[in-house]
Amino acid sequence: LAVLRRIERERRTSCKKKSVTNKYIIKMPMKLTNGVSFPVTGKNSARSTTSTGKRIMAAALRGVGADKEADAILNEKNWRFGYRKHMENVAVAMSKSNKDCVKLARAGLEEARKIFTYRIKDGKEESLERVVGRVGESGSSSSSKPSREIHTGIVYGEKRFKGQGKLPDVEYEGKTYSGPELVSLAKTFAAQDQALDSFAMSVEEAVKHPEWFDLRGKVFVLIGATSEMGPLDILLQCGATVVALARKNSRSKPDKWKNLLRRVVDTPGKLVIPITRAQTKDDDIETLGNIAGADATSELLEIVNWLNSNSIQKLVAKDSSLHIYCGIYLDGEGFVRASVAMDCIVDGCTNASKNSPPTLLYIDTPSHVHFVSPKIRATSEEYRKKAPAGLKILKSLGFAKAPKYISTYDSSDWEIHDGLSIQQGPNYAVAKFLQR
């Protein structure tokens, strides 16, 4: 224990010294890619994720008059490890009112549009805001014209839809739960304070209404359809029409699209995909897999035009709308670019929608700043008191993290849980902020 304490003490001391901290951070030059790009921020055409992320978060705070906190972000010298307290300040500013939440979010997204650029193959760059603003217009400059037309491919499931629908089964600890058993399991979690009462109530309502899971005629756009945690399979099983967006096959994943297309076969769903040419009756799954794919970050304009085309819009019922899921995950700076691109795609579809505005969906993350009820905090602290002795020792050494809570603006019925993971870094935090 003495040795472990000394190691942890030295680690903490070294992290406080900027010179030592930076010694272990290898700054790789950013690889220039076509499409959504970080702006030039320094000498020799340098593009900094740090200054860009700081500008977005500072602009968000200025949107609600939090100038002092915004200045603190811009003056932060150690953004890689110091971004955490600033994310907490953003959450506090959002806690003032629902109106401030919207104003702060809008200000952050608008700043991202203003400073990010859109780069085409010949190296020309233009403000992303200008490019997105001209989506669908004729006579736009060459830098904002789509480089290709995306065609529509459709693969139908071979299984017939039975009955009204049904809440999908849930596997837990080697057992499959459905119906009353699933409700009982959810209530057990709630009784043990492992989930909120509203969670158990929602599961019970879903079991009572199997018709909710008849998604025939509903159109879901999955941006990042191949993501591990995406809802592709469950939507297809419920008979939905899924418009799948993902990058083309690569050397590391040569069968990505073929494997994705096979997932629709044993379902009552329908899979709509972007392809490079018109589909023919002779195209099988392998053929379609080789010509499928579109990149959200580098083919943003092409994707927006495709989603707004007649071939996609005719799938949407007059009394319905698109449901757009933003699910791309990339490492590092790519995640920020992807989040900005997904927001632009959503905006392009919203502005062109003739029906109701699209419904937006995304997967949240536990490793960010969240609003929680006092009951959640009390339960968390109670469980921590009952933790095994070994876990308490690790916590005292700094190897196990205890939840951190901060007060909201007016200390109301909500508290703020800081679940940020420093290992993930500020790019991840900024990207998830943009999605939220």
Predicted regions and their residues:
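Extended alpha-helical scaffolding regions
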Residues: 288-369
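Low-complexity, highly charged intrinsically disordered N-terminal segments
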Residues: 69-195
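A short, basic/flexible loop-to-alpha-helix module at the beginning of a structural domain
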Residues: 196-216
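Long, contiguous domain-sized segments
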Residues: 359-436
